[in-house]
Amino acid sequence: MELDNFFLAEYDPRNIDHKTVIIKLENADRKDKNLGDLEYHIEKINKRREYNRCNHAYISYYDDIPIGFISIYTENDSYQISYGIIQERRQEYLGALLLQEFSEKMYEVYPEIGNLTLTIKPNNEASRKLAKLVGFERQNTVKYTQRRM
């Protein structure tokens, strides 16, 4: 899937670049556990796709280099986004740019989506700031939503 500044490849566990991104994200996240078990998360997404076409896990490429993970999935009648940028590419505003472009693309591709949701742990200050920067509004201590324009 093409975005303005990124290319998204559907996650393939046989692709070494894809596996490397997931391993880097899980290793960087061991302390805070913001992303959780990504392999399990991806399995759940693939199972949910059988019932709803809006369930996908992607590896994001920037300048042809894999820099992160982003997914859309349905949970409790809402459309959730989960994302992560590998440690060595953080602090470059790639997360904000990726989230903004991905959100716009999801509204374009899936007209049934009325709003998107992020679940962000209270201790994840960087993601909370990023969500607000991209136009997500805080609903409670962990939930942020963005409505279709």
Sequence positions of predicted segments:
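Conserved N-terminal entry element of GNAT/NAT acetyltransferase domains
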Residues: 1-27, 149
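Short alpha-helical
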Residues: 16, 76, 125-126
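Alpha-helical elements of Rossmann-like donor-binding domains used by nucleotide-donor carbohydrate transfer enzymes
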Residues: 20-24, 40, 97, 101, ...
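C-terminal "cap" of GNAT-fold acetyltransferases
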Residues: 3-6, 133, 137-149
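Conserved acetyl-CoA-binding loop-helix of GNAT-fold acetyltransferases
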Residues: 91-106, 129-133
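Acetyl-CoA-dependent GNAT
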Residues: 28-82, 88
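A conserved beta-turn-beta hairpin within the catalytic core of GNAT-like acetyltransferases
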Residues: 73-83, 90, 109-114, 142-145
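Conserved beta-strand-loop-alpha-helix junction that forms the acyl-donor binding cleft
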Residues: 116-128, 137
